[in-house]
């Protein structure tokens, strides 16, 4: 029976970053990463829009994102291509939002600027949608835009590949096509009586039951995203997160292709990652295909449910997203869907950021809430501190964060006031 020092379940971006930082701090640890996929980053990491921003009013969110962006930037600068493009985030806003305290705070906090209605029109965006359509669909006129300049897009497979390359060089073992079905609990000190563990015994996770047999370890870490509930509920542990389906549509037209080179910031001629004012539909430029990836995170109306192989619904696009898009962006009028896919966000509905919890010899990294890529490296550093029992950790770039602030019992995450 092989026994590891640490068994990590989940080879998505959170699991890979956690493994990287734990192994970096503890080079002698014997670590194995399990995943049900045929290789790494095949779950929701692969389906991510993979955009990044440091435009957050919440200091917690800002620390996690800005630290990760700085790390990724340095990795790419040193020669490992992550597909990073600093084409900016463009938040299109009505008059009230543009003049809000949140925007004024951000202009003083992060590298950002305001662009005018005229500049927005030059991008190919209609600032005043048709009045009748606006009345029916609750569309807002655009007064201006907030541009986050230390923001942009990247390629999730390249980021995952960076971590895997480093981990393999450090001797971390990977076991793919290995579905973890159950966490097996046992008494810390066995009496070998039937019915153990009893309520008066200290308990630990002894092993994980998988499709490839049982794996044993001294310590365990779950980075299982929306599947965390399935593993924790049988133990009576609440993950405090829910799965939220997100659909992405790759949309093409001749006019959309022309829009791709219209920029608002950065050295490249590349359209910014853009968020419409209402509904807050995302437009993610894809420089390779010269198409937009279109997505929207629904609130009320989209239930919390989990499908094993989710698909995107083109009727949903036609009846919901397209009707809004053609009013704001005329280039969508003669467009067509070339591809589509769907995934899930692991939503922490308390404050929309990661949750780090420790139960027995089990660490849990959960609730990335759609920000997994942009906060992943910092999340891995917090996970390493949680694993080692440290009270705080110093993130890449020098900022410090308390581990308990991102837990549950002593959670201290300041409210995000830039609501998109």
Give residue spans per PLM region.
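Beta1/beta-strand and adjacent pyrophosphate-binding region of the FAD-binding site
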Residues: 1-14, 32
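Dinucleotide-binding Rossmann-like beta1-alpha1 core, especially the glycine-rich loop
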Residues: 49-132, 280
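Central helical "cap/lid" subdomain
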Residues: 210-266
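Flavin (FAD/FMN) cofactor-binding and adjacent substrate-gating region
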Residues: 95-203
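Flavin (FAD/FMN) cofactor-binding core of flavoprotein oxidoreductases
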Residues: 118-128, 153, 312-388, 397-414
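Glycine-rich FAD pyrophosphate-binding loop
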Residues: 23-45
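Conserved Rossmann-like nucleotide-cofactor binding loop
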Residues: 14, 39, 227
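Active-site lid/adjacent beta-loop-alpha segment flanking the redox-cofactor pocket in flavoenzymes
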Residues: 257-360
